[in-house]
């Protein structure tokens, strides 16, 4: 193992001892935010430190067995022990290298998931509704909380645009590769001739911003408009100006929220979405600069990229980034996304490992 990697692992082992001591103090829960940060850090370090302990044990086993080589009666046994221990060390080192890959600081965050109907008119809006159901069912399987923040329903059902907040540990880490263009090929319910139509939606996955640390919004940069919330077809659902539209003047970003009867709560939610969009914008600009140096297949998150095709007549979903086709469209549309999301995460890790190899 490289000296730099050994040094890093020793530091992490020492840090784990420090965290254990801090968590064992009587006043450990006096500051709940700090307590949560420590427990999260401990959960991240624990598997690394456990694997490192196993690697060191295997190294000790090699040393012990080598001392037996001089004994003719024990030589064959010692050689077998050395071979087995070195194989364990090789396996553990590869796993440790994976565990030490740079972590995305947003991985633990809640997310705002935005789905917009694109080309295809009413069929695209219906597909936006299908995508929302797919992600909602997946969230339910993870025992996450789902909140609709903003919705613009279409006349025939589905959504022109919908934003939901998904609350749960690791929400961003699981769904961050869903940003991009989603294309559907199927016979629309409104199609009398039975012809297959192609339409598309755009999905954006944005980590929830920390209001204190991530994004500071100057009130002078905002224009705040209030208006009456309306339902499908333009009917008014209440008689007060409870709906809120925020315009961020420097960037031109606009957020509307009208799902709550309280203007105050609608404004709070709109501010949360705006902060997430601003954070997302900053990070995508940074990623674009990085991508100019090294093109990432999985993690570009470019909204214009067509990432996936849902072909209903053939019963398949194809993710174009990793050339993966799964012939179980009904299960996938019902939220059974584990295999697909796992394959994307594995490919991303492979890219990271390859990049580390290039740097070495």
Swiss-Prot record:
Compartment list: Cytoplasm
InterPro entries associated with the record: PCRF, Pep_chain_release_fac_I, Pep_chain_release_fac_I_sf, Prokaryotic/Mito_RF, RF-1
One Gene Ontology term, aspect cellular component: cytoplasm
Domain of life: Bacteria
Record-listed N5-methylglutamine modification sites: 235
TM region positions: none
Sequence ranges of Basic and acidic residues compositional bias: 280-293
Secreted as UniProt keyword: no
Region called Disordered, residue ranges: 280-305
Pfam families registered for this protein in UniProt: PCRF, RF-1
Gene Ontology molecular function, alphabetical: translation release factor activity, codon specific
Post-translational modification: Methylated by PrmC. Methylation increases the termination efficiency of RF1.
UniProt keyword annotations, A-Z: Cytoplasm, Methylation, Protein biosynthesis
PANTHER family reported in the protein's UniProt record: LD18447P
Homology family: Belongs to the prokaryotic/mitochondrial release factor family.
Function: Peptide chain release factor 1 directs the termination of translation in response to the peptide chain termination codons UAG and UAA.
Name of the protein: Peptide chain release factor 1
């Amino acid at each position: 193992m490289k000296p730099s990697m050994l040094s890093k692992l020793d530091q992490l082992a020492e840090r784990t001892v420090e965290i254990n001591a801090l968590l064992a103090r009587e006043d450990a829960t006096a500051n709940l935010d700090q307590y949560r940060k420590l427990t999260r850090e401990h959960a991240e370090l624990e598997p690394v430190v456990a694997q490192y302990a196993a690697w060191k044990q295997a190294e000790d086993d090699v040393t012990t067995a080598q001392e037996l080589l001089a004994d003719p009666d024990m030589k064959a046994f010692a050689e077998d022990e050395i071979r087995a221990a070195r194989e364990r060390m090789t396996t553990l080192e590869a796993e440790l290298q994976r565990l030490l890959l740079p972590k995305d600081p947003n991985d633990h965050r809640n997310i705002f998931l935005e789905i917009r109907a694109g080309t295809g008119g009413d069929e695209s809006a219906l597909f936006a509704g299908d995508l929302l159901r797919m992600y909602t069912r997946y969230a339910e399987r993870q025992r996450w909380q789902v909140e609709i923040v903003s919705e613009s329903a279409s006349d025939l059902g589905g959504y022109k645009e919908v934003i939901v907040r998904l609350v749960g540990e690791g929400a961003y880490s699981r769904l961050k590769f869903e940003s991009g263009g989603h294309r559907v090929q199927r016979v629309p319910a409104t199609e009398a001739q039975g012809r297959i139509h192609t339409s598309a939606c755009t999905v954006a996955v944005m980590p929830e911003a920390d209001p204190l640390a991530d994004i500071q919004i100057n009130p002078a940069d905002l224009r705040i408009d209030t208006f009456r919330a309306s339902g499908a077809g333009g009917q008014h659902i209440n008689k007060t100006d409870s709906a809120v539209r925020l315009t961020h003047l420097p960037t031109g970003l606009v957020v509307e929220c009208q799902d709550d009867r309280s203007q105050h709560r609608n404004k709070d939610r709109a501010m949360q979405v705006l902060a997430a969009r601003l954070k997302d914008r900053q990070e995508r600009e940074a990623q674009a600069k990085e991508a100019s140096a090294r093109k990432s297949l999985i993690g570009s998150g470019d909204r214009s990229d067509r990432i996936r095709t849902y072909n209903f007549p053939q019963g398949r979903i194809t993710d174009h980034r990793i050339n993966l086709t799964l012939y179980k469209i009904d299960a996938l549309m019902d939220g059974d996304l584990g295999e697909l999301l796992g394959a994307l995460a594995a490919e991303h890790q492979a890219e990271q490992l390859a990049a580390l190899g290039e740097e070495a």
